[in-house]
Amino acid sequence: MLTLGLESSCDETACALVDANAKIVANVVFSQQDHVSYGGIVPELASRAHLQVFPSVVQSALKESGVSLEDIDLFAVTHTPGLIGALAIGVNFAKGLAVGCQKPIIGVNHVEAHLYAAYMEASSVEFPALGLVVSGAHTAIFLMEDPLTYKLIGKSRDDAIGETFDKVARFLGLPYPGGALIEKLAVHGCESSYPFSPSKVPGYDLSFSGLKTAVLYAIKGNNSNHRTPLPELSESQKNNISASFQKAAFTSVAQKLPNIVKKFSCRSLLVGGGVANNKYFQSLLKNTLDLPLYFPSSKLCTDNAAMIAGLGRELFLSEKITSGITPCARYQWESASVSLSPLP
């Protein structure tokens, strides 16, 4: 069984193929560069770019795997959550391919695919497992009974951790996206230079808006307001702020996990999302938890279609399918309580 996956939830246009053994045989990602000058994603530009490059991205994936569309047995596409226009482009393109090839199609949840990405590359995972999604748009903690069954334990009440990194990068005068740049600067900084505190939200939820504001005041001064311009910072200041902020942000997440592991007798940890690629974060989690940890490779941390194809294949084989696939911008947290949220 050969599954072709498509991803277009934000600014990456991606196509991948996964074979009958869940092995990735092609993984092509086109990253849009037009948004850099705007300091963030412009939804209309993203949608137009998806429309323009999807045909060539699919052709590249087929060429890489040495197959044709007629060889595809199943199509999988991201249908939620994400930018509604971008999702609509991907869903309609995938539907056209499926109808033309007279093959089945299945919708995949982008957040749940991030959770599945680490499982794809793991040799064996012991369950129940703790699942952690840390990306630019979502931050959430799940209890996983198996790869397709889980419940939501906690999530960010405001900004996602990746979004917070990008906003702090903007405060520092760094280009978008800024998460990887902060990680690089932090290596040369002192993480105790600024007394940024980790989140103190009770329970298993998270919050990053307070930390973001603390960084802003550390840069502009406590008596500043929204009209106060951002000052020029020295290289050492940028390094120290990056290191101190990074420590506080990741400690906010890591400090929640030991109690969850103990309460639910978790036997492993699966981490997904672009922020999972941060080496400081990986090291912190390894030092915090005494259990097997699974991170996706760099190519599967960021948005990609391999995780969409992989999870789509699992869902299809498990018969977790409904008749319709409709783009939906928001993640339905309330549906993540027993099993994978039903496809609309």
From Swiss-Prot:
Fe cation binds at H110, H114, D303. NCBIfam families: gcp_kae1, T6A_TsaD_YgjD. It comes from the Bacteria. It is found in: Cytoplasm. Binds 1 Fe(2+) ion per subunit. SUPFAM superfamilies: Actin-like ATPase domain. Its cofactor is Fe(2+). Gene3D superfamilies: 3.30.420.40. Its EC number is 2.3.1.234. This is tRNA N6-adenosine threonylcarbamoyltransferase. PANTHER family: TRNA N6-ADENOSINE THREONYLCARBAMOYLTRANSFERASE (PTHR11735), TRNA N6-ADENOSINE THREONYLCARBAMOYLTRANSFERASE, MITOCHONDRIAL (PTHR11735:SF6). InterPro entries: ATPase_NBD (IPR043129), Gcp-like_dom (IPR000905), KAE1/TsaD (IPR017861), TsaD (IPR022450). Belongs to the KAE1 / TsaD family. Substrate binds at V133, V134, S135, G136, A137, D166, G179, N278. Pfam families: TsaD (PF00814). GO terms for cellular component: cytoplasm. GO terms for biological process: tRNA threonylcarbamoyladenosine modification. The keyword Plastid does not apply. Required for the formation of a threonylcarbamoyl group on adenosine at position 37 (t(6)A37) in tRNAs that read codons beginning with adenine. Is involved in the transfer of the threonylcarbamoyl moiety of threonylcarbamoyl-AMP (TC-AMP) to the N6 group of A37, together with TsaE and TsaB. TsaD likely plays a direct catalytic role in this reaction. Keywords: Acyltransferase, Cytoplasm, Iron, Metal-binding, Transferase, tRNA processing. One of its GO terms (molecular function) is N(6)-L-threonylcarbamoyladenine synthase activity.
